Design a protein with these regions (language model features):
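Flexible, low-complexity segments enriched for small/polar residues
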Residues: 3-27, 260, 264-299, 308-516
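Cell-wall polysaccharide-cleaving catalytic domain and substrate-binding groove, primarily
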Residues: 2-56, 147-151, 159-160, 172-175, ...
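Residues that form generic nucleotide/phosphate-binding pockets
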Residues: 19, 34-35, 43-50, 91, ...
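N-terminal accessory alpha/beta regions
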Residues: 15, 27-133, 206-207, 218, ...
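Active-site substrate-binding loop specific to GH73 endo-beta-N-acetylglucosaminidase modules
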Residues: 2, 66-68, 80-87, 119-353
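Short, compositionally biased low-complexity segments
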Residues: 13-22, 56-59, 75-78, 164-168, ...
Length: 516
């Protein structure tokens, strides 16, 4: 049976949780149970459904969108934060959808940072491009990102003119965005830069309400022929003149790159590391990467069929791969909120609550070394580009901060607006088949919380030393029955709630909770 063959067996609870952990920022128990029993083919159709186009981010003071307003230096920091909070809110509220996980993949692939671009309206506009193309055609995606105003700013494409070519984008287009190191030469970088001369952005930090868009200036374009190396079979892109020269030559450049078999392999490897595992062995390369790269090439570089094949494959559902990825700060922090059904308020009727909650989440992400829309380099976040180093998310500092985040949730000390960010352990216990039975309670919680199985000694410790703190196990049964016989009694509710809360806090601190 080939690794890429479709897995057609209805999903178990653990398999459904595995799919949802990898394809979203984390499932709720209800979503796990909803997907259990479905075939992967049915499940992926739900995940691939196109969500409604989100409303743009708003200024927290006026609650009005700012993407079409004139630039305002005094509000730039506020708008930058509002754009980040807007996207975090979409991640939290996304439901069982692949979209936001794919948008993050592409934002970390086609890196343009808010700090460098320094115009929140540009970064928001780019995010709309990322989500529009997230599961579309890769060729069209590369072409549009090449001309994207934020990208032109970030990699200096707007400074690339005839006679004074800027090679930044021509290099990253090949090294990071399409084909990878070792598959082009320095002369190819120079030739690509000449192809790309003449593009510039309009509307940057404009104090009038002009459109943010891209313009091709024919007079700044290199009209001579561009000769590429043997890596590209000595292709010549003929120099053009006139208003269509930029688009024509850009299309030929992208076609030349994508005609190389390595381009499809390069992208499938990145998708593999994002969704499955960082370790690509020779066997995986031959039996998984190469077949899916052929699907990508033969499908004219359509993204959706490749992602579908990957997420429904026999290999994806290999039990050995569950828990093989360390959660990013987003997967940990947002995933925990999503698991407990905590949603982001609407920023328009409740700007204070929305801003306070998103600021809290963003601060936790940043201190755990993931600043959304602001990667440290053009390579993206190191755990994704430094092959095999997902564990870079965790060190002695960030591990303590991860634990602090979940401790704050169980303590219920974080407020946003008029609400408190708190988990409800009693409600979570009631979702198990028999919360009065400590064995069933811990077993079912563990199955929902963790990507890998706990040992029996771990389960026993959670029951005997954490939940009931050294008492006989029947004591928990009695305490739960006492509570349910008088559920409005605050003292009885507090008694079980405190024990469940302590158990949650301990489970969050287990190494297994850091894995997905």
């Amino acid at each position: 049976m080939a690794l890429t063959d479709p897995y057609r067996t209805p999903l178990t609870l653990q398999q459904a949780a595995h799919l949802l952990r990898r394809a979203t920022f984390g499932p709720s128990p209800a979503q796990i149970k909803q997907f259990a029993g479905q075939t992967p083919q049915a499940a992926i159709q739900t995940l691939l459904a196109t969500p409604a186009t989100p409303a743009p981010p708003v200024d927290p003071t006026t609650t009005k969108p700012f993407d079409t307003l004139a630039f305002d230096t005094t509000l730039q920091g506020t708008w930058q934060n509002a754009t980040k909070y807007w996207w975090l809110g979409l991640m939290i509220n996304a439901g069982a959808s692949l979209r936001e996980k794919m948008v993050l993949f592409w934002q970390n692939h086609f890196v343009s940072t808010a700090a460098v671009v320094a115009d929140a309206r540009y970064i928001y506009r780019q995010n709309t491009v990322l989500r529009r193309h997230a599961l579309g055609n890769f060729r069209s995606f590369v072409i549009e990102m090449t001309k994207d105003p934020a990208m032109l700013r970030y990699l200096n494409g707007n400074q690339n003119v005839v006679g004074k070519p800027n090679e930044n984008y021509g290099r990253e287009l090949q090294e990071l965005f399409t084909i990878g190191v070792g598959n082009y030469t320095e002369d190819d970088v120079k030739a690509a830069a000449r192809v790309l001369t003449g593009w510039t952005d309009t509307g940057y930090r404009s104090t009038t309400t002009v459109d943010i868009t891209t313009t091709f200036k024919a007079a700044q374009h290199d009209t001579t022929d561009k000769v590429f190396s043997a890596a590209y079979k000595n292709t010549v892109i003929k120099g053009r003149t006139g208003s269509t020269a930029g688009d024509t030559e850009l299309g030929e450049l992208v076609d030349m790159i994508l005609a190389q078999p390595e381009a499809a392999r390069f992208m499938v490897r990145k998708l593999y590391r994002w969704f499955i595992n960082a370790d690509i062995t020779a066997a995986i390369e031959a039996n998984f990467i190469e077949p899916l790269a052929q699907v990508f090439r033969q499908g004219n570089y359509e993204i959706k069929p490749v992602v579908t094949a990957l997420l429904t494959s026999q290999h994806f559902f290999d039990d050995a791969l569950r828990g093989s990825i360390v959660k990013s700060p987003l997967e940990l922090n947002i995933g925990t909120l999503r698991f407990f059904g905590i949603t982001a308020p609407d920023a328009v009727p409740n700007p204070t609550g929305f801003t306070q909650l998103m600021a809290f989440v963003q601060a936790r992400n940043v201190e755990q070394q993931l600043n959304i829309m602001d990667q440290p380099t053009v390579f993206g976040w190191r755990p994704y580009y430094d092959t095999g180093f997902y564990d870079l998310w965790i060190n002695s500092t960030t591990l303590a901060l991860r634990g602090s985040f979940t401790d704050q949730l169980t303590a219920g000390t974080v407020k946003f607006g008029t609400e408190k960010l708190a988990l409800d352990p009693v409600a979570m216990a009631k979702q198990t088949t028999d919360p009065s039975d400590p064995v069933k309670l811990i077993n079912e919680w563990a199955a929902l919380f963790f990507a890998t199985d706990l040992t029996q000694s771990q389960r026993d410790f959670l029951i005997d030393e954490v939940l009931i703190d050294g008492l006989p196990r029947y004591e928990w049964n009695l305490e739960w029955q006492t509570y349910t016989s008088d559920p409005t009694n605050k003292n009885k509710l507090m008694a079980v709630s405190m024990k469940l809360n302590t158990t949650l806090q301990y489970m969050f601190r287990l190494a297994e909770y850091q894995l997905c």
